[in-house]
Amino acid sequence: MSSITTLSQPANQPISVLGGGWLGLPLAQYLQAQGYEVGVSRTTAAGALEVSQLGLNAFAIELAAATPLPDSAFWHAPTLLITVPPQRGKAEGEQLAQFERLIERARASGARQVLYISSTSVYADDEQLATEDIEPAPTKLGGIMVSQLERLLQQETSFRTTVLRFGGLIGYDRLPDSAAAVQRRSRAIDTAMNVIHRDDCVRIIHEIVRQQAWGEVFNACADAHPMRRDYYAAAARARGFALPDFGPVQPQPYKIVSSEKLKARLNYKFLFPNPLDIFEQPARDVL
């Protein structure tokens, strides 16, 4: 039985965005433009000042494993959106401890709902259609880490957690624009892509908040899943650069991630349903 809640959250309700980076900052700006009272965090005072100069309520917050997180107005919003990715090079136990401190602070501050930005890397590359009903079986360190963080948040009973598993994030400065850029990214060239444009990420998060779709797990990837080789070819045609020689096709294990549940529950239509078309379309102004 689904535990989803589908009421509508008033647009003036406070929301806190933990992590004002590549996704979190434009998300905070978009939510503020929709009428929400938004707080957003950066890890340093200098970073918080930079964000505040954009007209956002900014806070310097760095997750710590050994000490409790100090209280601040940031933590007193009923809705907390966690956009902090796993930290490369940091021990698994330390990252879990950081999230335990985060949960303690959210509980003490009265958070009612949490959205955790996870990843489709929780699914194995085993030729499957990956739906939310499949038990995660990550094989890479990043996927193992986010899977553990998902469980940690879902086990907490003082607030309701929705897990949002994004595919690879693309758009803006995360699009191949030269042969050198393609060469740097030319791993797994003959596998299907599970990606999502940042504009879609922002809109989907807003719909989850607006519709109060809490206590759920959603996958979020573009409808089409082109081979990476074809994606790079589309970029080269649109941007006028020559592709490096990838050699013959060498099929490799991959997965196809389904977003049908998200589209049905949120009545969501992707802005960029086919990654191959992104190079021909300007990015939407989500603000």
Describe these PLM feature segments.
Residues 75-115, 148:
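NAD(P)-cofactor binding segment of oxidoreductase domains
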Residues 202-259:
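Mid/C-terminal beta-alpha module of Rossmann-like enzyme folds, strongest
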Residues 61-64, 250-287:
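C-terminal amphipathic/interface module of NAD(P)-dependent oxidoreductases
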Residues 148-172:
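Conserved beta-loop-beta element that borders a ligand/cofactor-binding pocket
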Residues 24-25:
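N-terminal Rossmann-fold NAD(P) dinucleotide-binding loop
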Residues 14-19:
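Conserved N-terminal Rossmann-fold NAD(P)-binding element of oxidoreductases
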Residues 100-139:
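Conserved Rossmann-fold NAD(P)-dependent oxidoreductase catalytic core, especially the SDR/UDP-sugar
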Residues 165-166, 175-178, 185-209:
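Substrate-positioning beta->alpha
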